């Protein structure tokens, strides 16, 4: 079959029109080794630090070590199928996680994938896990209280919105219980909560989810879980992922609370990754940048001003400040708060709540040591009524602790010393509080008023808790208007003091306990 010249030229024209001369740039490397969740890749010359690397089987890696001839990356997921000689590709993207209101009430892993069996998370919004913290110009001083509902914390170690308050103590001493109670107490306040579980047993996380659901707190809470069975890489990035989810609310003029439980295990995971990447070890075998690991995370918790929120939302939200409050948890070994990671985090945060094993075993729960616990900025944010009535509590406890040791050796004590010991014993008893029994501002103020004005002094120590329960029950039924007024305003004046006096004296007269 012969083709005419016109047909030949027509075919050539068709071929020319279909010809695609676009160039596809693809940075490709070869995996030279894979072991313990670390891949070494040769040939990725234009990769950036912290960039996502596409590995075989729809798995990604995170570039951490950039050497002259190779890249060390940590695998975010299973790596059993990856072998030497496989290809790896640059993506030009950094790691992002889903954010937004749709995550509330859900349990997700460190990459934001749902693990609660409730289907996909209905959000298209994502945010990088690593972000620069807001600068000094965009910040606002902490002056709004974040109520935990725990008497000993709100009266002596107050927490403000935008603060970083460390919870530190040995294992099995009630650190998580304080954090969970604080999350439950935010119900109805508009504060969104993020609980980041790092290196915990899956059964423990399931138990916390159940507790939050029982108390109606899951509706305003996101749980980010990197369990003990997850890789060190996921335990390392989980706090940053949770922080990005919290920043979504902060940057839109809302208040959020994030709990990191616990950063000791994150430091262990990072130490493991660093040693596998052959980075030089330092004190306690941690890498040199373990301080920066926690400082860049905790500096993102802040209270931002109206201008920041307006600029971030392109003018959609005006006249509102946003905050992200952080409660990092650190586990100590045998009460050693002078170890490397505890001292690092103490120096980064705005105060610490120190829990003691001896106090816990003696029945004082929460086992807070008021001498070592401090809040550096929360005093300015404390509710006025709690600030006024709580000052006497700290003083009474300090005097009691000082005299307690002395009184063991002295046989006869003068009346004033005996009165201080008497008051201290009853205040110590009053500060005991069961888990899941958080108090409103008004009920807490009522308890503190009774202690501060000597209404507990003539009670037996065993009668203090029953008296408090009767006092609260009476106030909520007979004096509900006073309780509502205090909860709404939080102010303290002569009128409020008179009303509190009437309630306490009414309860003392009835002796209903």
From Swiss-Prot:
Keyword presence, rRNA processing: no
EC number(s) reported in the record: 7.1.2.2
Annotated Gene Ontology cellular component terms: plasma membrane; proton-transporting ATP synthase complex
UniProt cross-references to CDD domains, sorted A to Z: ATP-synt_F1_alpha_C (cd18113), ATP-synt_F1_alpha_N (cd18116), F1-ATPase_alpha_CD (cd01132)
Membrane topology recorded in Swiss-Prot or TrEMBL: Peripheral membrane protein
Localisation per UniProt entry: Cell inner membrane
GO molecular-function term, one example from the UniProt record: ATP binding
Catalyses which reaction(s): ATP + H2O + 4 H(+)(in) = ADP + phosphate + 5 H(+)(out)
Site location (Required for activity): 373
InterPro entries registered for this protein in UniProt: ATP_synth_asu-like_sf (IPR023366), ATP_synth_asu_C (IPR000793), ATP_synth_asu_C_sf (IPR038376), ATP_synth_F1_a_nt-bd_dom (IPR033732), ATP_synth_F1_asu (IPR005294), ATPase_a/bsu_AS (IPR020003), ATPase_F1/V1/A1_a/bsu_N (IPR004100), ATPase_F1/V1/A1_a/bsu_N_sf (IPR036121)
Top class in the EC scheme: translocase
Binding site for ATP: 169-176
Keywords annotated in UniProt: ATP synthesis, ATP-binding, Cell inner membrane, Cell membrane, CF(1), Hydrogen ion transport, Ion transport, Membrane, Nucleotide-binding, Translocase, Transport
Entry's family note: Belongs to the ATPase alpha/beta chains family.
Assembly information from the UniProt record: F-type ATPases have 2 components, CF(1) - the catalytic core - and CF(0) - the membrane proton channel. CF(1) has five subunits: alpha(3), beta(3), gamma(1), delta(1), epsilon(1). CF(0) has three main subunits: a(1), b(2) and c(9-12). The alpha and beta chains form an alternating ring which encloses part of the gamma chain. CF(1) is attached to CF(0) by a central stalk formed by the gamma and epsilon chains, while a peripheral stalk is formed by the delta and b chains.
Stated role: Produces ATP from ADP in the presence of a proton gradient across the membrane. The alpha chain is a regulatory subunit.
Record-given protein name: ATP synthase subunit alpha
